[in-house]
Swiss-Prot record:
Keywords: Glycosyltransferase, Membrane, Signal-anchor, Transferase, Transmembrane, Transmembrane helix
UniProt-annotated stretches for the region Stem region: 45-83
Gene giving rise to this polypeptide: KTR3
General function of this protein: Possible glycosyltransferase that transfers an alpha-D-mannosyl residue from GDP-mannose into lipid-linked oligosaccharide, forming an alpha-(1->2)-D-mannosyl-D-mannose linkage.
Keyword Membrane (UniProt): yes
Anything else known: Present with 704 molecules/cell in log phase SD medium.
Family (UniProt): Belongs to the glycosyltransferase 15 family.
Protein name per Swiss-Prot or TrEMBL: Probable mannosyltransferase KTR3
Superkingdom, natural source: Eukaryota
Region (Catalytic): 84-404
GO cellular component terms listed in the entry, alphabetical order: cytoplasm; fungal-type vacuole; fungal-type vacuole membrane; Golgi apparatus; nucleus
Length: 404
């Protein structure tokens, strides 16, 4: 009796698996290899990771990285990105009508620096910002955009000012062609920048500030977190250009300052930078000051008893109105007298312009590394007489760059 063997039937899915099992096996093995490679790479990556990936200027440890001679002379280090943000903020005082000049400044700061760090930006105005201003600027900044209105008493003529005397003085200055000599808004701005901006509630959560004005240009990539730089190097005030003040705008500022110091000698730092602002050990003021169109530093310094009491003393004298005291000489005198001179820093390697002056790194290797687009021949940093950077280096006992 013959036996008929029946062929065992298999489900269609099983037939498909058998048919393609070699290809599936190969793909699975390939996937395992790729995942293993990615895991290995993530585990071996240096902990000093740039905050944002894919940029050409993320500051990582490199033996090829160059520091400007002036930074070496001042004894600082450039911090490596560690992914941790400081309590820093960009601060801009602007009107709604400044919008289309301001957007260029914002793009310069964002493209050259903040698109990697995403620090917040605070905008302040003596009038409410328009919807257009908020819409355009908030689209440009990489951090949070915050908008505040200046309190009325911070942008008005205080009660102790004799308005008739004020009008007489300012109109007389206008006839002498003193810059902004007759301007009332300019005086409000200088007074606000001198004594009130860091008191605004929007700045309470921050420790460091970078003042960004309209009509500025940054020519170079900033290769490190500039706020972290201040912190790790124990710097309280930084500048990029220093110039001489127009003497007829501040005829009594120094005498008023000396009266304050006489009453409050405790605020005068033993290791101060007096030699930067005076050629005769404090008898007279030589008009040198840090240009505040680029200004970066510690908010806590301006919140200190020394600075607040100094400003209040100046304010009570009426000089912001009867004369035309600027915020730049006020800030500069305060920093030079109340800080250790080692807490002040001259920034190089950034490239900066605000009408009518330009800072361009003197070293070609720095300009190339930082992708600077400034014209070296237009740099005024080391020009003698009107500009004061040489005097700052002399007062701080720092070496000048070769060739200066």
């Amino acid at each position: 009796m013959s036996v008929h063997h029946k062929k065992k039937l298999m489900p269609k899915s099983a037939l498909l698996i058998r048919k393609y099992q070699k290809g599936i096996r190969s793909s699975f093995i390939g996937l395992i290899i790729v995942l293993s490679f990615l895991f290995f790479m993530s585990g071996s990556r240096s902990p000093e990771v740039p905050i944002a990936q894919g940029t050409s200027v993320s500051r990582v440890a490199s033996k090829d990285y160059l520091m400007p001679f002036t930074d070496k002379s001042q004894g600082v280090i450039h911090p490596v990105d560690d992914g941790k943000k400081e309590k820093g903020v960009m601060v801009t005082l602007a009107r709604n009508s400044d919008l289309w000049n301001l957007v260029k400044s914002i793009r310069h700061v964002e493209d050259r620096f903040n698109n990697r760090y995403h620090y917040d930006w605070v905008f302040l105005n003596d009038q409410p910002f328009s919807d257009e201003f908020k819409r355009v600027t908030s689209a440009l900044v990489s951090g949070k955009a915050k908008y505040g209105t200046i309190p009325k008493d911070h942008w008005s003529i205080p009660s102790w000012i004799d308005t008739e005397k004020f009008d007489e003085k300012r109109l007389a200055m206008g006839k002498l062609d003193i810059p902004y000599g007759s301007s009332v808004p300019y005086r409000h701005m200088c007074r606000f920048q001198s004594g009130f901006i860091w008191r605004h509630p929007l700045l309470e959560e921050y420790e460091w500030f970078w003042r960004v004005d309209t009509d500025i240009t940054l020519f170079c990539d900033i290769q490190y977190d500039i706020f972290k730089f201040l912190k790790v190097n124990n710097k309280k005030y930084g500048f990029i250009l220093s110039v001489s003040e127009y003497e007829r705008t501040i005829p009594t500022l120094w005498e008023t300052t000396k009266k304050f110091i006489k009453k409050n000698p405790k605020f005068l730092h033993k290791n101060n930078l007096m030699k930067f602002i005076s050629n005769d050990d404090g008898d007279t003021y030589n008009m040198c000051h840090f240009w505040t169109n680029f200004e970066i530093g510690s908010l806590d310094f301006f919140r200190s008893d020394a600075y607040r009491e100094y400003f209040d003393y100046l304010d009570s004298s009426g000089g912001f109105f009867y004369e035309r005291w600027g915020d730049a000489p006020v800030h500069s005198i305060a920093a030079s007298l109340f800080l250790d001179k080692s807490e002040i820093h001259f920034f190089d390697g950034l490239g900066f312009h605000h009408p009518d002056f330009t800072s361009c790194p003197i070293e070609q290797k720095i300009r190339l590394q930082n992708k600077c687009i400034c014209e070296p021949s237009k740099d005024v940093t080391w020009t003698p007489d009107y500009f004061c950077t040489r005097k700052y280096f002399s007062a701080g006992n720092y070496k000048l760059p070769p060739g200066i």
